[in-house]
């Protein structure tokens, strides 16, 4: 029987609050999780930008109410999430991609998924002219000692949520108020900084989609329209 590449629907969600993006991905994951067999699952790749927000993952216990208040006073929101990883920033100029996949259609392994996600981002960076981008023992994708892409995922019953935040033309000053992903002595960078030109999210999206289809060996289809809310998808 010939191999049929899994189908993934691309949802271009635009810019909105972190809460709205979280509700969208949770709804998509919940609506499909009950399906059996996994072949019936509808896979999604949600592309978006967030309003300024600091998020902390499952392992973060260090950020107190005072820390949260300090960060909110900068003009950003603050959320505790169910993803892996420590604190990071999302905001305008950053391409956030949330793959909502049933790994039963790919490889049923969270370890494989994280490694493939890393490979996908590295491939996309190479396509955009950053040949030195690579994965290391530290989470995320790096250019030298500077992180260009954060990775934090959640998996339940082989259904993935959360994903990546690729700095395109992000204002990197937001990162100066935290220790990104809890890694001391390292910095952050962006496509714009590395390539010495303005690199918008829309331009990066094309390379990311090309890389995603190639590395995950899947077919991509565009969702019919940009959703105004999670209720418009299903």
From Swiss-Prot:
Protein name: Putative lipoyltransferase 2, mitochondrial
Domain of life, per lineage: Eukaryota
Entry-linked HAMAP family: LipB (MF_00013)
Reactions catalysed, as given in the entry: octanoyl-[ACP] + L-lysyl-[protein] = N(6)-octanoyl-L-lysyl-[protein] + holo-[ACP] + H(+)
Further information: In the reaction, the free carboxyl group of octanoic acid is attached via an amide linkage to the epsilon-amino group of a specific lysine residue of lipoyl domains of lipoate-dependent enzymes.
Role, per record: Catalyzes the transfer of endogenously produced octanoic acid from octanoyl-acyl-carrier-protein onto the lipoyl domains of lipoate-dependent enzymes. Lipoyl-ACP can also act as a substrate although octanoyl-ACP is likely to be the physiological substrate.
Upper lineage: Eukaryota, Metazoa, Ecdysozoa, Arthropoda, Hexapoda
Range of the transit peptide: 1-28
GO molecular function terms attached to this record: lipoyl(octanoyl) transferase activity
Keyword annotations from UniProtKB, A to Z: Acyltransferase, Mitochondrion, Transferase, Transit peptide
Main location (coarse class): mitochondrion
Gene: Lipt2
CDD domains: LipB (cd16444)
GO cellular component, one term: mitochondrion
Entry similarity comment: Belongs to the LipB family.
Entries under SUPFAM superfamilies matching the protein: Class II aaRS and biotin synthetases
Record bears the keyword Transit peptide: yes
Active site: 181 (acyl-thioester intermediate)
Site for Lowers pKa of active site Cys, residues: 147
Pfam families found in the cross-reference section: LplA-B_cat
E.C. code: 2.3.1.181
